[in-house]
């Protein structure tokens, strides 16, 4: 019985299936962890959701920012962007079933036995695990309720960018969703920077990757995350696993087998384009 952690799929269904075949994944005995951003950019978002949903208890996933954006499009709050290639999913006969399932998925996974935590973007160093779990529950409760469109309408924005237990209402929920699904860099005091996306060696001072600032969670648990393709899976401290390696941009899909920490990769079926970083079919 093995635990496989896979980075952002982004609708790259064929690569996901090929990678699972490579590691001989068997849902009857193995468990699959997914770092979020199941959808958008790749051609197979519909197939990815159908497959992942079919795995039932054999999969543990977290929501990413693209998953939340898809839910906002589904709710009529945001417009579908052609580059996200979501039209087949939104027009599918089982779209309601799939997306209502998706909005009931968590923002945080914790395995106490493995001392392993997973979130799409990571864990802000301002939180201990108890705070992170409570914050995740706060957003999950709203997303799974009938009032979820009100949150999705208010989630877009970069403020507040500093955690306080005094935060309340939609401002609190926006910080939580940004920390779990959009965070990359922090100031030394833990305040989020929502603008910089470059690789750490190119980031302006005094910004640091969130994982470079010691925090209560990273001191006690391993953390797996996706979201940050420009890291290319490198440059993180021991116990911090960056799993997004840019499959939808022409990179590869990466899998970590937890038990022996062995990595497996599946090359993208797409090639890198020089046109504004977009990927085109090969």
UniProtKB/Swiss-Prot annotation:
Keywords: Hydrolase. It catalyses: P(1),P(4)-bis(5'-adenosyl) tetraphosphate + H2O = 2 ADP + 2 H(+). Its EC number is 3.6.1.41. It comes from the Bacteria. One of its GO terms (molecular function) is bis(5'-nucleosyl)-tetraphosphatase (symmetrical) activity. CDD domains: MPP_ApaH (cd07422). This is Bis(5'-nucleosyl)-tetraphosphatase, symmetrical. Belongs to the Ap4A hydrolase family. PANTHER family: CYTOCHROME C5, PTHR40942. It is an enzyme of class 3 (hydrolase). The gene is apaH. Hydrolyzes diadenosine 5',5'''-P1,P4-tetraphosphate to yield ADP.
